[in-house]
């Protein structure tokens, strides 16, 4: 009903806009047949529409590696092969480095101080430099290593109290990721494990903002309507963000009053670099939001695949028992001796990249990609989900086979375009050095400490792996398991 009301209310406005400002671009990439005004939108929202990622895969196979889609009055380009991704993220990295935030994220004053949604201007360069050289530097990550291990241990200890029960891990994995980020940001846990809580804490607010960002918004497809906030998403996002600020503003004020001469976390670093309160709030939100959601989703996917494939799980357990031992706990110092663990994480990211359709790169100036003309102002998306499942680059692409990475030189650095879970080029995810530490640490801790069974006698091979894509890619049905003690 929400869709119908939205389309009826805007049809006349859209028609007028279409007639007055009909695009005159030529030499665009190929495009499937489209409806007048609404473009390809009905292909996504009709009753029999396939899931979005399946739809994107199908049309890429039919129309080629670079396609042009029109959702309402918003046109976008989608790159779905490693060759197309290379031209977008490497050849045209600079000219395709712009950003256009989703309407619901355009809340003042946050959007004016955003790094994630900023064009590659001087403020963006300063923020990215601080993230790379200080906050996610080797030195600071090493200094926080024990905190990450303690956070992973706390998760294991809590699950120990649930041994034999049917549990959903998702909220606890999300909270664990939040606590890791809490120590990155201001050296504190921000989530407490509990069975039930009605308290609206940081976890619920951040999760709420992520859900709001993934909701249907007619303004995303008909930009002329953005000012009206027809679904109330921008208002809702603003309310949630203000509540988040209240949680950490006391810590920010206290640190300003007592500056740390040797910065130990993000807050210290930002204060030392004279960031104002709006800049700090924006940086905090863009650390907690994307980092908690993507990291926890990957861990859930990895554990689900291992449960579904008992031979892979047994192989990983054998490696952990041999290297870590049954009387010890997993440490980051073990990583260099755990190649199969690393292969399991990479294979999970190949199948389920953290951001399956990357945040769009806005074209700053008209450019050429694969012989096609991309006009100034158009958004270009890279489909990492399709690239990671391309049969030209991956044998049996839909199978979970960590072994494919054991004798491979493929890394997370975005240089090999068949595997770009964190993106590539100047817009590569700045939190990558943290993610490749916390994901294997938590996954290994869960596999090492527990045996896992599916409830109701469901065979492992019948585990439901249906995907749900919003801002990120998660399991459509949260993983429900029964933990059994191993160590």
From Swiss-Prot:
Keywords: Alkaloid metabolism, Endoplasmic reticulum, Heme, Iron, Membrane, Metal-binding, Microsome, Monooxygenase, Oxidoreductase. Its EC number is 1.14.19.66. Coiled coil: none annotated. One of its GO terms (biological process) is berbamunine biosynthetic process. It is found in: Endoplasmic reticulum membrane; Microsome membrane. It catalyses: (R)-N-methylcoclaurine + (S)-N-methylcoclaurine + reduced [NADPH--hemoprotein reductase] + O2 = berbamunine + oxidized [NADPH--hemoprotein reductase] + 2 H2O + H(+). This is Berbamunine synthase. It comes from Berberis stolonifera (Barberry).
């Amino acid at each position: 009903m929400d869709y119908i009301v939205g389309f009826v209310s805007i049809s006349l406005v859209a028609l007028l806009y279409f007639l007055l400002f009909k695009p005159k671009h030529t030499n665009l990439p190929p495009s499937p047949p489209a409806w007048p005004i609404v473009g390809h939108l009905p292909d996504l929202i009709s009753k029999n529409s396939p899931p979005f990622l399946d739809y994107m895969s199908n049309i890429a196979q039919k129309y080629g590696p670079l396609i042009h889609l029109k959702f309402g009055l918003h046109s976008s380009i989608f790159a779905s092969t490693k060759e197309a991704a290379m031209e977008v993220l490497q050849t045209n990295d600079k000219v395709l480095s712009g950003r256009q935030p989703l309407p619901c994220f355009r809340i003042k004053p946050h959007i004016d101080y955003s790094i994630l949604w900023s064009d590659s201007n001087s403020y963006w360069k300063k923020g990215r430099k601080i993230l790379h050289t200080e906050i996610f530097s080797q030195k600071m990550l090493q200094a926080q290593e024990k905190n990450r291990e303690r956070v992973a241990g706390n998760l294991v200890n809590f699950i120990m109290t649930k041994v034999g029960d049917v549990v959903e891990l998702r909220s606890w994995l999300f909270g664990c990721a939040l606590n890791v980020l809490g120590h990155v940001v201001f050296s504190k846990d921000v989530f407490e494990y509990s069975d039930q809580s009605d308290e609206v804490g940081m976890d619920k607010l951040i999760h709420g903002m992520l859900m709001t960002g993934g909701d249907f918004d007619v303004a995303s497809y008909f930009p002329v309507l953005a000012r009206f906030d027809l679904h109330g998403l921008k208002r809702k996002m603003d309310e949630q963000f203000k509540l988040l600020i209240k949680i950490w503003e006391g810590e920010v004020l206290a640190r300003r009053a007592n500056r740390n001469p040797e910065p130990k976390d993000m807050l210290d670093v930002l204060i030392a670099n004279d960031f104002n309160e709006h800049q700090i709030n924006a940086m905090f939100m863009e650390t907690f939001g994307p980092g908690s959601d993507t990291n926890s989703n990957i861990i859930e996917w990895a554990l689900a695949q291992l449960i579904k494939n008992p031979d892979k799980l047994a192989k990983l357990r054998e490696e952990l028992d041999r290297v870590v031992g049954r009387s010890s706990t997993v440490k980051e110092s073990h990583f260099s001796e755990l190649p199969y663990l690393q292969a399991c994480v990479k294979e999970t990211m190949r199948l389920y990249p953290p951001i399956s359709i990357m945040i769009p790169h806005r074209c700053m100036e008209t450019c050429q990609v694969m012989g096609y003309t991309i006009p100034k102002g158009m958004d270009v998306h890279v489909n990492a989900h399709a690239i990671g499942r391309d049969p030209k680059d991956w044998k049996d692409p839909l199978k979970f086979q960590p072994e494919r990475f054991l004798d491979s030189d493929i890394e997370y650095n975005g240089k090999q375009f068949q595997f770009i879970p964190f993106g590539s080029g100047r817009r590569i995810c700045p939190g990558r050095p943290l993610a490749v530490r916390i994901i294997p640490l938590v996954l290994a801790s869960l596999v090492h400490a527990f045996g896992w069974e599916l409830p109701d006698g469901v065979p492992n091979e019948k585990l439901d792996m249906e995907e749900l894509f919003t801002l990120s890619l998660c399991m459509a049905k949260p993983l429900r398991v029964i933990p059994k003690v191993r160590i």
